[in-house]
Amino acid sequence: MTPLFTGPGAVSKTLDLTLWAESIGYEDVWLPDTGAVDALTLAGVLLDRTERMRVGIAVSPVYTRTPAVFAATVATLADIAPGRFVLGLGSGSETMINGWHGLEFRKPLARVRETVALLRQMLAGEKSQFDGELLRSHGYRQPPLEVDVPIFLAALRPRMIELAACAADGIVLNLFPLGALPRIMETIRAALERAGRDAGALEVATRIQALVTDDADVGRNLFRRLFGPYFTNPVYNSFLAWAGYEDEAAEILEAGAAGDWRRVRAALTDEVVDDIAVVGSREHCQERLRVLAEAGIQTPMLFCLSDDPEDQRRTFAALSPAEMSVAA
């Protein structure tokens, strides 16, 4: 489950929804680190108040915190609830890193690789001795973790998937058309084989944009409004084209460059949206989650497209582990 609240009351709303979700059988809660509410601070609140749920970050951009800051934060969160925290890392985007933070979005693959390598050194309690292409650290040391914290990596394209297969404990997918999932899973399998790791060595998680509703058009339009801008980003746009929607990706890129958001939304046809999002009746959404699980998705990170509390609870209740077991 992925709650996303912003503004006054965001922490209490997230906590209330998370405690309710834990009470109906959810095993994980995942927090996006995109601003407005600091995900790592919020994770501490949730770890302290929940009893058994994993609390994960999906994901934090590697440019906005140094490895030493990540290491200290991870140690703190791991101490609150040993064995229940998961750190997800990713590159972020040009818009986020350069636009929001004023930082250079340089060599994202190398930056993620070096961050993971240096962070693992620090979490093991070693004195840092690292000179990379982009990062360096000397003399930092903290006590080793008593219980390892898994590191997940966000990945869309083959090179980042390759890195996750080599260096991570899990992989976070996002916004992929269902029809592209076999290619993605084969890419992961082949990357693990090249890395000399077992097929089950990498936990495969994905964000799922969902809404249980009697009016699928409502969910589709929410998806277009919320995620249309994502596909104007070159990374997501090229991923959409790679997944088989070349014409739609080209139209979105052109419309986005012109600032024509109506065209962007229109290019996300019902076919495209239905291939990516999980929107519709309870039975339809449950079936989609079963299809994803059968294809190799182990950890669904459900995000409700609506911010209406009734929509959220209906969606999360219908797709809870208990309900999925009954419906199987």
Regions found by a protein language model. Name each.
Residues M1-A328:
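Active-site-adjacent structural elements that line small-molecule/cofactor binding pockets in enzymes
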